[in-house]
Amino acid sequence: MSHTADIPLEAPTLLKLASSSVQSQINNDEYMETVILPVPLSQELFARFRNKWNIHNHGPAPVEHLGPPTDEPRPDQGNIDMIKQVFRIWSDSTRLPLEKLNLTGATVDDQIFVDLLHAHAHSITELDLTNVTGVTDLSNAYLYARSTHFPMLTSIRMTSMDLVTGHQPRRKNGIASTEFRALFMLGEEALAEARGQMERDGLRSPLSPSSQPSSIQSDHQSLDALVPCDSPVEPPLITARAPNVKRLFLPRCPAKRTTIDEEEQNTHVILTKILSPLQQLEVLDLSYWSKTDDMRCLQPLSNTLTCLILYDVPDLYHAVPNICHMTELRILDVSQSNRDSGLYPHPVTTLNKLIVSLKYLTHLDISSTNLATQPSSHDNPARYRESVRTDICGLQSLVRPLKYLGLFNCESASHVREIPAEVVSGDANEDQVITSLQMYKDRAGLLQNVLNESYQLYRFGNSNPLTRHTEALHLVLEAMHRHLADSTLQIAGSASLFYIIRKVDMNRDTKRRVVSALLSGMEVHMEEQVMVRNCCLSLCQFEIPQDILFDYSRLAVLLVSVLQHHNADNLTQRIVVFLLNSMACHVEGDQKVQVGSYGAIEMILDQIARKHTANVCDDVMEVGWSFLWNITDETPVNCELFLNANGLDLFQKCYEAFKTERELVRNMMGLIGNIAEVDELRSQLMKDDYVKIFCALLESQEESIEISYNSAGVLAHMVSDGEEVWKQMTVCRNEVMQRIVEATSSWKLATRRFINYRSFRPILRLLPLYHAYASQHWAVWALANLTTTDGEKYCAYVRDEGGVPLLEELVSNAITTTDIRTLANTVLENIRNVENKRNPKSIPADLAHSSNSPTFVPSYVSDVEEEDEGDVEADEEVQDFVNVDFDDYALPMEY
């Protein structure tokens, strides 16, 4: 399979390193009150905190409390407090100057917001208030009271309209909106009361006499609290305080595009009030506005405006004449998210009129409209000029090809042969889809459809070879990051990722980004079965657990949660159990304890119990027991969790129901073996029913010795506890020991094992137990077998873990049985052969027999025993249900 190279890794810049160092001192008041930073470092540090509060914002939105106030803190109170702290620190512009003030995603109040703006009023050139909450039209009054102006500000971006629409008082039903006579307005006395209340609450009021404009300060007339007012004074909007703004981005929130204020006040009046102070405006974004009528409010900007973005503004056919008067336009975007709102009565004529009128146009987006449709008998304008080759009739009057043309979701327009543009967004080929991902990354409505096209493209391919997987990967990741709360978009993105990541040689950072995106999507949309399945399928393409160790705990918690929420979806269950089993392999005890602490053992047992009740033995059950085997390996805490959850009862039930399922029985006995190795827990196995099962399995050697070997190991540990603990049993201990020896003697010493030991300590502890000759026999056979079949690996384990002296003691002790002595000599001979092979001249024979050699445990030896990585057949069985047929399950969305 061919792969595309990932983007190169980049070392952190000095600026990032420096900002990281300063960030660590944020709670050091003495440091933060004295530090002085240059603008670039102050900007970078502020951006770090912005990223931090936006990460917290990805959690569930706080539910608005109804009724009287309570003392309970908001769920996001910690994040709000952090934002306030950051705003207060940066309100000292002398030490922490800012030129670009980006407050995206912040939750603030008017007071602290105005403090920050006022501090940097004379230096900021860009102001970004995207998704800022808590700011109201009261901020305009505060700015007015403090005479704050922004002479350097050239760019404003915001999604909340309060700062630009001003206060719109709601009227009672039946009162005309133009009737203001005999209305009452609070006067100075009421203002003084409000100021006193604010100061009692610990807030500094910007409306105190010392901070008011001189005209207000000089007004000492005694006014009643309520006085008739024919012309109430309204504070100027923020645009009136920044007359040099050239770029104004005012996209409304799609979910709140129709508000009461908008219904009560003509949109033309609102926009005129916003735009009239901006005599130098060049770029204007009014995306998602509605009821814009003919947009005559744009006429005063006809000589300056070069970019007009009207994405998802409905019924734009009313505004075409006024748009055509904007003759300086270079960029025009009239695209829609839905075709229904982008229908023009005479589309070909309309597009032709725009092209003829806007002679400087270089970028045009008409996605999800009918403007690129073919002409009809009543809609076929005459060609104004013949300059370009095009199969789109409405563009025939172009003087030169466009630099960019948006044609996504314009029926088949992006598939025609002649398109007069250098770059095109559409769905005809990979280049068009990549361009669409780039252009519509902020537009959820269009982006969802683009991601669906991406899914189709990278799953089924195209007539041309696909070569831009890496770009697609990073664009899809960005889309999922920007629109985490949109479940349909997350589903489409996760499905695309499934097919893209298999063709990219991802570097470390990209792997982390992909895993984080999948986990975040799954975390926020846990109830969406398709989303959860897509994410789990994509995770199966990573090396588990290596690629997820950086977020190991989070994934474990999520997978357990998936088992709880989606226990009826068999495919999802199979994938999750496989992932959990993979996570339990090849990790150290601490991480296994973590997984156990999140309830994974209990959840897996619950799934196994469901399967048993349904009398079904499938992948979920088999891999579930494999997970339990791995998660309890050398981890007594997890063994105890298994026992406390009545795991032994379930073991007995599953054995009785499915005793012919060899893989299942093998996994179950591996788990029981882990429990048998724990001295404090082994007594719970001392029941006649369990011992009879273990003894019966000693003779199970149909395909391999694994089940018989595991059963003998369990019994070997049980009989090692001595005669006393067996007195309560009806099964005779001596008879059990004899059966262990008989089973062990029947195994072929050269049998290759499907087990991967990383420590021999549990086995070596049985060697000195002369009161339990069967335990010795099983232990020494295991050592002889492993050092014979894989001496290069296991001889070092015996020597380094102190096994040589124990074996020599067995050989020399008179009460050792002949078979045990023979096996012990075999192990010692294997060790000598391996050592001589490595250093044939440097190791004298007498040293090879020495029992005084020091015991040393190397760093590569751990206390964990796990399934053999070399067990190719077993591994393929587990992998089969992950890799086969999954192409039919990763879905972009349910149509």
From Swiss-Prot:
Stretches the record annotates as Disordered: 58-78, 195-221
A cellular-component GO term for this protein: Cul2-RING ubiquitin ligase complex
InterPro entries with a match to the protein in the record: ARM-like, ARM-type_fold, LRR_dom_sf, LRR_Zer-1, ZER1-like_C, Zyg-11_UBL_adapter
Compositional bias (Low complexity): 205-220
Keywords: Ubl conjugation pathway
Keyword flag Secreted: no
Subunit: Interacts with elc-1. Part of an E3 ubiquitin ligase complex including zer-11, cul-2 and elc-1.
Summary of the function given for this chain in its UniProt record: Acts as a target recruitment subunit in the E3 ubiquitin ligase complex zer-1-cul-2-elc-1.
PANTHER family in alphabetical order: PROTEIN ZER-1 HOMOLOG, PTHR12904
Name of protein: Zyg eleven-related protein 1
